Structures are given as structure tokens and as C-alpha cells.
Regions:
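Domain-core detector
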Residues: 1-150, 158-166
């Protein structure tokens, strides 16, 4: 079906997003990391509001909502990329025995929402969450409990080890 074909194409994109997130983490932490397939599948197939990414895609395709589909794909890519960064940081932390901190970084333009401007430059330990002034919280960009804090988010994490200088 058309929906299955589109979902399969987007799956390829999300696999690439995860690979790129692992590579970004390896670069930030100067450590060789490889993709853990189970962690990648868990990140890609995360159920949000009772739906997988395939269900969310189907909703937009069936409704012929191309704009909504584009926004969904951009948000899914961002979510999976950031999940990979966090997974890679946990892998580094467990194998190297060094603590990792994560810093919230926005793109610093006029489109950054106020709840994310509030987080600019905030650093927390890897296992801690970021808290916005509206009461929302997330371990990383794209993981807030409120959809309005995730959709079109372009924020990223900067990861540093306990021995790094910021």
C-alpha cells in the first residue's frame, strides 16, 4: 500500500537519523561508539499517544495532509537523532566509567519558543531531566510530555564528560 511504502521510506530516514546521532555523540565524547540495533529500534518505534511512527504517518497520508506529514517526519527525525545521542552517552558512561553532562542548546533565532529559550545553556547530569517554566520536562529535545514543546523543535544537546572543559 501507499502508506506502507511511505512508512518504509521514512524508516530508512529514521535509521539514518539514529546513526547520525551516534556519530555526533562519538565526536563530542571522542570515543568510538557503534549502533546498538535494539536501542535503535526502541527509539524509532517509541509509542507516543498510543501510536507508533507508522500509525502517525498513516494518519497524515490517509488525510492527504502533506504539510502535517512533513512536520511529523522532521519531528520524528529530530526525536530519533536526540535519542541516539543520549543512548550513545549512556553507552560511553557505562563503558568508560566517566560521568556525562548534557547542555541544552537552541539555534538562537526568533523561532525558538520561550520554553526552550529558558533552557538555553542549562547543563544537567545525563540521567537528569530539563524542566521548562510551563512545568514540562524532558531528558532531551523531542521528549517533552507536551506535544507543543516537541513539534518543530530544533534544539540539540552538547555532551561533555566530567573531565572535559566546557
Amino acid at each position: 500500500s501507499k502508506v506502507a511504502q511511505i512508512a518504509d521510506d521514512i524508516l530508512s530516514l529514521l535509521i539514518r537519523a539514529y546513526q547520525q546521532g551516534i556519530t555526533a555523540t562519538a565526536d563530542m565524547l571522542a570515543y568510538d561508539l557503534t549502533v546498538d540495533v535494539d536501542s535503535m529500534e526502541e527509539a524509532i518505534y517509541e509509542v507516543i499517544d498510543g501510536k507508533t511512527f507508522e500509525d502517525r504517518i498513516a494518519d497524515h497520508v490517509i488525510a492527504r495532509d502533506l504539510s502535517g506529514l512533513q512536520t511529523l517526519v522532521e519531528s520524528e527525525y529530530h526525536r530519533v537523532f536526540n535519542a541516539a545521542e543520549e543512548d550513545g552517552a549512556y553507552e560511553f558512561q557505562s563503558t568508560r566509567g566517566l560521568g556525562v553532562s548534557k547542555k541544552w542548546v537552541t539555534v538562537r533565532d526568533e523561532a525558538v519558543r520561550d520554553t526552550h529559550k529558558y533552557l538555553e545553556g542549562v547543563s544537567v547530569a545525563l540521567d537528569e531531566e530539563f524542566y521548562t517554566f510551563d512545568g514540562d520536562h524532558a531528558s532531551r529535545p523531542g521528549e517533552f510530555t507536551k506535544a507543543e514543546n516537541n513539534v518543530n523543535c530544533r534544539c540539540v544537546l552538547k555532551l561533555v564528560t566530567d573531565t572535559s572543559q566546557d
